[in-house]
């Protein structure tokens, strides 16, 4: 089993990559999963979990259930189980479950521990590591949340065997995001290798990138913003389509394409670099047709992004391959001209 240590000022923890080991706990544990994952993997976890008391809370599957109602269900289960400050929650699922359980554990009794056991590629390489938690609101995605680091993360690649191809590819989008902004060697590996032949190495490399970024910038003041490449546009797309048409990773892939268009227009990408990223997305079937219905309304949605400040939109744009730049004060006319391609 491989380990990555994430040493933070207030709390350090480990990410374990390998077969899920026996987890022995001396306290109560509330497992939260969704209606699909629980049917596939809950028994596998229960076979390996030893705790003072175990209870399971199952939430409906899907991004549209990442809301106040689901959060309340998790907290009600915790109260009914009489969890205390020494108890913990366990997130078994994808990014939606990871985000919600992290947030629920951060506000229950002003904060208790939680463990992440991600079952999707997207959650394994991104959502489960770093402590960003939250829920969606009618106004936008992840607008209510907190920074709350897990006690541990267990990444078992055998969970991925039950993923549909579409879900798997959505996770690859997040790997490409990290590669383009932080690691040109990973870009080259994705371009030249068959991912099936090097999946464990790529997952480890991606988690390691995320870990290093989080250690440098836990609360997203500077370098961690690079992990939001594609997300300003992507979140607007998810909201506009009511979280139903695209998976999160798919929306981010479209968002990266829009960000690339903007970067190209600003001279931050050469045409060759632009085409490299586009071809990489094509390789993993991550090029999608999307039509913006109302250009002005879509533009206004961009201001609801958490990175926006002083009435300006902050974009994370690739600066060549392996680097990025956070940029604001781009004229509205420039943004709308780029988005015309999608209108």
From Swiss-Prot:
Entry binding sites for NAD(+): 61-66, 95-99, 119-120, 132, 141, 159-162
Question: Which keywords accompany this UniProt record?
Answer: Amino-acid biosynthesis, Aromatic amino acid biosynthesis, Cobalt, Cytoplasm, Lyase, Metal-binding, NAD, Nucleotide-binding, Zinc
Record flagged with keyword Lipoprotein = no
One Gene Ontology cellular component term attached to this UniProt record is: cytoplasm
EC number in record: 4.2.3.4
Q: Which cysteines are joined by disulfide bonds?
A: none
The catalytic activity, as recorded, is: 7-phospho-2-dehydro-3-deoxy-D-arabino-heptonate = 3-dehydroquinate + phosphate
| GO MF annotations in UniProt | 3-dehydroquinate synthase activity; metal ion binding; nucleotide binding
Task: Tell me where on the tree of life, at the top rank, the source sits.
Answer: Bacteria
Listed binding positions for Zn(2+) are 174, 231, 248
NAD as UniProt keyword: yes
Q: Which cofactor does it need?
A: Co(2+); Zn(2+); NAD(+)
Segments forming a coiled coil: none
Cofactor binding description: Binds 1 divalent metal cation per subunit. Can use either Co(2+) or Zn(2+).
Localization in the cell: Cytoplasm
Q: In which pathway does it act?
A: Metabolic intermediate biosynthesis; chorismate biosynthesis; chorismate from D-erythrose 4-phosphate and phosphoenolpyruvate: step 2/7
InterPro entries from the xrefs? Dehydroquinate_synthase, DHQ_synth_AroB, DHQ_synth_fam, DHQS/DOIS_N, DHQS_C
Q: Which family does it belong to?
A: Belongs to the sugar phosphate cyclases superfamily. Dehydroquinate synthase family.
As for what it does, the entry says:
Catalyzes the conversion of 3-deoxy-D-arabino-heptulosonate 7-phosphate (DAHP) to dehydroquinate (DHQ).
Q: What is this protein called?
A: 3-dehydroquinate synthase
- Origin species, per record, is Helicobacter pylori (strain G27)
